[in-house]
Curated annotation (Swiss-Prot):
Residues 49-86 are annotated as: Interaction with the host capping enzyme RNGTT. This is Protein Tat. Residues 38-48 are annotated as: Core. A motif (Cell attachment site) lies at residues 78-80. The keyword ATP-binding does not apply. The modification Asymmetric dimethylarginine is found at residues 52-53. It comes from Human immunodeficiency virus type 1 group M subtype B (isolate YU-2).
Amino acid sequence: MEPVDPNLEPWKHPGSQPRTACNNCYCKKCCFHCQVCFTKKGLGISYGRKKRRQRRRPPQDSQTHQSSLSKQPTSQLRGDPTGPTESKKKVERETETDPVH
């Protein structure tokens, strides 16, 4: 290690910054250009804000599709259409007719 001038700020020490500027190339040489390039390009770590993906615009026909859906009748509930009260009455009748228990 060479002795460093104590009057220099740490960011101005020789060898602290590369001679060439960083670029957007992802080749092996550029990935190992400096520590910043290595973490960003080599490791794929960036601490900046993530860009929001824009949603793809729906096709123009989507509005007509929505209107056709609203014209369709709503589906009826599955199961016993009379509801749960009818099944309770059936259970009460079965217990009355079966006195063995």
